[in-house]
Amino acid sequence: MEQIADLIRKLDAADYVMLTVHTGAQARYYYDRFPEILLSVFARNWKEYEDIAISGVPWKNMIAYVGPSINDENRKIVDLLHSHGVRCMLSVAPTHDKLASAADRHSKYLMEIATHPDIIESDIPTEVNDALKAQAK
């Protein structure tokens, strides 16, 4: 972490980077050094949510990775994060992006879009965009 902090400082990059952190302690480490930095925090379950919540890092400094989908298991966490003004991100890269056919991927993307994530991370953003356009019609 120290090397990353040194690089951010050297490049004066705190205003235009977002760091992914996996624990509240990591979030606090970077926040203490760069109070305006944006952090992508892990909040896939209650344990991770609580770890971030007690870190003392302001909610305004966070977006939250909630897993590969928004579902019954994490919906309450997503709602709680939203109540704090935190945008929630899911990642389809390790799941839907790996499906062999574009039609299958499109169908899965539409399922995720229906859960209203704030951010969708994908290795095939053009296909996610096509699904977003199709859903909007």
What kind of feature is each model-predicted range?
Residues D12-L19, I37-L39, H116-I119:
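Short active-site oxyanion
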Residues M1, L7-A13, T20, V78-H82, ...:
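Secondary-structure boundary/capping motif
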Residues F42-K137:
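C-terminal active-site rim and adjoining tail of enzyme catalytic domains
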Residues K10-A14, R33, S83-H84, T115:
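Alpha-helix C-cap/termination motif
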Residues L11, F34, L132-A136:
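Active-site catalytic pocket residues across diverse enzymes, especially alpha/beta-hydrolases
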Residues L19-H22, I70:
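Alpha-helix N-cap/loop-to-helix boundary motif
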Residues A25-Q26, E127:
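Alpha-helix capping/helix-boundary segments
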Residues M1-K10, Q26-V41, W46-V57, A100-A103:
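Distinct, well-ordered alpha-helical segments
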